[in-house]
Structure formats: structure tokens, C-alpha cells
């Protein structure tokens, strides 16, 4: 949970006394109209909650809806189920009740209003995982409740968004491969299907550039179609690299299976890294080195922001980027000169 904002914090930002802040927020005389408006605007931006009001609002119970696209619930796609569980647990600890709705691919295309929204059952909505901008725009117009995006952002339809640092994370794990002696490194993920995949590709690309390498089309390998349906098998390139950077652990798992079918051993012949540091136990017989997503921190921020919006204490919209960690396991072999 974020640290509570105090009057002193606002005063320090504006270079005025705490007494001036108190007078402005309580409507007392002694503060110019211009300064009063400036203080109120900054207090709202910083998420300040007046004493007493905060306690009263925190004791309220809210209903939070979670909307998850159908294609994130396909076989073995466990990351979003786990993230939903973490969000739900976090919300329950904040005195909230959580309901989930799975949005079918057809309903997304048809711009169908979710039942959670149509039935006015919720006080706030979490959109978990990327959806089409047209659908998000419809939600913005029809859902008269605060909305927070989790694990994606949208430039066309801006709401508060909580994401992992995909750009830096993939940059870091690609550099990790370079530190292990790899120079021929491929990327596995269909570009432009989601902003997350594209951001991760750009992090991979930055690492290559800094090592004097250029991206090659032959080593940009798709893992799903443009409708975001994941392939069961990853098609290997004709000319093989020594390592693959995958946009997620599930894709890394499928790649490892494809490699083994073609007679390659991981990591003895080819190294593979992923992203998420989460995969269903027993799904892959190789422990995948990965850039881990801090789900707990993402959930805390998402619930905290949504609560402030439901309570009316936050109206500005922002992008919250959560750092992750390198999870070094057994899918990378160091190359020796």
C-alpha cells in the first residue's frame, strides 16, 4: 500500500507552510484564491486524504470487477489466472469483494458491454491484459465507474495503468545472455499484437545495438497470430542462433518443446530465456531463466489506485511501472571461447 500523503508533503512541494496548506484545504481565510486552487490541485494529484475522511472511506466495502479476455484463459495460460488471484487476495484484504468476467473474442469484436458493467454490479473495474482500443473506448463511455488497466497500457484510451517494466526487463535479460558469451540471439514474439510484446522486443533490440549487433528478420519469430491466439508449436529458423529471448515463459516452454522435437538440447545446444518467472509446475522439464514480474507489487498499486478513485480522492491518470527481477535457473549455457 502506498504511503499516506500528509499536509507537510504538499507544503514541501510548494515551498509554503503547513498552516497555509491547512487553511487552503479547510476553506479558511488567509490564502489567496490562486494559491488555494494550486494547493487543492496538487493535493488531488498527490492523493491526499483528509484525516477522518480517510478512516470513514477505508471502512467502506466496494465491489471490484475484473475483466479478462478469453484468449488469456487458453490451455496452460496460467500467468493471468495467477495475477487475478493476487489482485483478488489484495482487494479482499482491503475490504473489497471481487468478481471476474471472461470476455469472449466475439464479444470483444462486437463491442458487447460486459455483464458486470451492464448490471451495475461494481464500483470499479480492473481490465486485466490488453484489449482492442475500440473495446476500451466503449468501456470508457459505458462504464460509469473508475477503471484501471493491469499489465498493459493504451495510448488511444488512457486510464490508470499498472505494468511491469517490459522494456528494461528484456533489455536486462538479453544483456545477461551477452554476459554468457552469446552473440547470435533471436527474439520470439509476434510484434504489434500487444504493446507488452513490442516493448519487450525494443528492450531486446536496445541490448543488441549496444553490443554492435543489428536485429535480423530471420531471428524475429512469431508465437501467435494477429488475433493473439498462441501457436502450439514454434517454427524454428533455418539458420539457428545460440540463444532465444522469449516474450513470456509460456512461449519459452513451447519453444523448448519444438527444439527438442528437432533434436536440440536446452541448454547444451541452445539457450532459452523467458519473461514472467511464472509457469505451471510440470509444464516444462527445463527450469527457465526469466525476468520475473512482481505480481504482488502490481496488485497493491492497482487496488490502491482503484480505491482512491472509487473514494473520489484521485482524478488524474498515470502510468505505474513496476520493476521486476532476474530469475537465473537452468536454461542458459555459458559459451566459452
For the regions a language model picked out, list residue spans one by one.
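Flexible loop/turn connectors
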Residues: 231-337
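Short acidic capping loops at alpha-helix termini that bridge into adjacent secondary structure
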Residues: 183-184, 215-218, 266-272
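Short helix-capping segments at alpha-helix termini
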Residues: 93-94, 208-215, 238-239, 261-266
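N-terminal helix-turn-helix DNA-binding module of bacterial transcription factors
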Residues: 1-60, 336
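Short acidic/polar active-site loop segments enriched in Thr and Asp
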Residues: 17, 49, 123, 182-185, ...
